[in-house]
UniProtKB/Swiss-Prot annotation:
GO terms for cellular component: hydrogenosome; ribonucleoprotein complex; ribosome. It is found in: Hydrogenosome. Its main location: other. Belongs to the universal ribosomal protein uL14 family. SUPFAM superfamilies: Ribosomal protein L14. One of its GO terms (biological process) is translation. This is Large ribosomal subunit protein uL14m. One of its GO terms (molecular function) is structural constituent of ribosome. Probably part of the large ribosomal subunit. InterPro entries: Ribosomal_uL14, Ribosomal_uL14_sf. SMART domains: Ribosomal_L14. Keywords: Hydrogenosome, Ribonucleoprotein, Ribosomal protein.
Length: 133
């Protein structure tokens, strides 16, 4: 369960390490579960060069600190109950960074680290697993 001002870790190779939530969707909900979209602000990044410049000829866009965007909740430290009685709990809250282009989700990273739950494996996420194979 994630709410506003929660610090989350990024589980893809987009360049960000930690983000903070400032908006949940839909907007009238205080707490959102796994599989939801939230708005975030990047708090910590991998430093590529010490002065923060981009390498010459590098095509991939670098994520900057305090950059805002959408992210998709993949893991939470809150227990997720299943019908058969099992519960699933992760050690950290993790997200994937997402950008929308003409109504289609495009993921910033090309690789996912760690596990995902059953809640995020649906027809809307086929694009994600196609990219990561």
């Amino acid at each position: 369960m994630i709410q506003k001002f929660t610090n989350l870790y990024v589980t893809d190779n987009s360049g960000a390490i930690a983000v903070r939530v400032f908006q949940t969707y839909p907007g009238n909900r205080k707490i959102v579960p796994v599989g939801s979209i939230v708005r975030h602000s990047v708090k910590k990044i991998h430093r590529i060069l010490p002065w923060g410049k981009q390498l010459r000829g590098r095509r991939k866009r670098i994520i900057c600190r305090s950059q805002c965007g959408r992210s998709w909740i993949v893991q939470t430290s809150y227990q997720i109950p299943y019908i058969d009685g099992a519960t699933l709990r992760f050690s950290k809250n993790r997200v994937l960074l997402v950008k929308r282009k003409r109504g289609i989700r495009i993921y910033r990273g090309r690789r996912i680290y760690g596990l995902t739950t059953r809640a995020v494996n649906n027809e809307r996420t086929i694009n994600l697993f196609r990219i990561c194979i």
